Amino acid sequence: MKFAVKNLSHNYSKKVRAIRNFSTELNSHKVTALLGPNGAGKSTLFKILAGLIRQTSGSIEINGTSWDRNDPEPLGKIGFVFQDPTIDGMRSGTANLTYAGQLQGLDNNSLKNRIEELVATFDMGDYITRPVGSLSGGQRRRLEIARALIHRPIWLFLDEPSTGLDIDNRLKLSEIIHLLVNSEGCGVLWCTHIPDELRSGDNLIMMKEGEKIFDGHFDSLEQVMS
């Protein structure tokens, strides 16, 4: 399944242009790293993809069909993990996953099986019943990603998922994401401003001041930079 962004632009005002004529195509079963400094337009792009704001111009297509923002169905094919935590720290990991599954309309039996599957995949058995507020940063990130996958999305979009993690947990997170691509068959867009995380992706998109400055395989970037 293909997810295409075509000539996307977004202006917050006449003087503030967050994204300028951005186009790319994402394929499932791949991890695409989106790299850019703070202010490059990455977070604005994620808000548009999540349906939180509308682009000023341009289109988003899924399998060649333009995404009508009045149709909520495409959002059901995407899982989002935002930079700022949105998980309930007072409730247990199990309760958070259960609530997310209920919002997605999963029946009790399917939800129970899915939670067990995700707990095993993310190795969360030792802490899944504890209040989220008592967990480490790495444990919370695993839980947030698991929650985004509760409904088996085709796409997983991650906005700065390694924020606040040390190098060991960053490496573990990268391993988990690649495992998910193989086991779940989903496509991943990994947004980051940390160059060390570039190798987490199969492909690379680079943004600067709202514009795309590179889109391709890492080997191509090395040739351009050499």
Predicted stretch roles:
Residues T98, Q102, N109-Y127:
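Conserved ABC ATPase "signature" region
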Residues M1-V5, S9-N21, N70-D71:
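A short, flexible loop at the N-terminus of ABC-type nucleotide-binding domains that lies
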Residues P131-L135:
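Conserved ABC ATPase signature
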Residues A50:
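Helix-to-loop junction immediately C-terminal to a conserved catalytic motif
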Residues L156-D159:
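Catalytic Walker B motif of ABC-type/P-loop ATPase nucleotide-binding domains
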Residues R152:
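Conserved catalytic motifs of ABC-family nucleotide-binding domains
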Residues G58-R69, E73-P74:
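Conserved ABC transporter NBD signature motif
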